[in-house]
Amino acid sequence: MNAPAEPAELSTPVAVRRLDGMLPPEGGEAGIRATLDAGAQHVFIGEDALLDGALVEKLVTEYGSGRIGLHVPVRRMQVSWSMDIDSNADFRVMTPSVCEPCWEILRADGTRSGTHAAWWIGEMFRLGATDALIQADIEDDADLNILAGLTERWGDRLWLAPLNETNPDLESWVNLGGAARLAVPDALYQNSPYLTALRSAPETGASNEDIG
């Protein structure tokens, strides 16, 4: 890995925030409402929105879109293969379940939901969610390409945080994946030379100081 970029070398200002306090409140919909009613300016909603497709729209109507975001833990979607005998009667070919690498959303217990992350985020944005906190472990170029596709589509509406990785290559997230907003555990926030450089660079976009 190259040496951390100096602030002057950063082509795009990047927001850096602590992950603590950005995760969804406990207690399901009641906990979300209690947090908003207590004055939280912004709440990220996770599995509750995945299980209830109407929840985001309902909360946006009651509290305003600027206060509702998405929490989206993801992992690379597994590919299964099946025999295609319909498209050409003379040939039998194996076809994959997904045509290109993509992320699927994980449930709160870490199991796979089978829900295509990019599709779901787009649907929730359409219903009024303002941004998304994506937790992912970027393991290879395929993950970087997925990230780049998402950031090209939604830009600084996306916060990116590590899922399980304790020492992620944040420089690649920014330079190759296009990440414009990073949310990291406190230890990484305090000790990463690269993040120190990012925090000293000019920042664009909305502040996250009051995100609940």
PLM regions with names:
Residues E6-E26, L55-V74, D140-D169, P202-G212:
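Alpha-helix-loop-beta-strand connector modules within alpha/beta enzyme cores
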Residues L19-L23, D109-G114, I134-A136:
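Phosphate-binding glycine-rich loops and adjacent basic patches that engage nucleotide phosphates
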Residues H116-E152:
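Extended amphipathic secondary-structure runs
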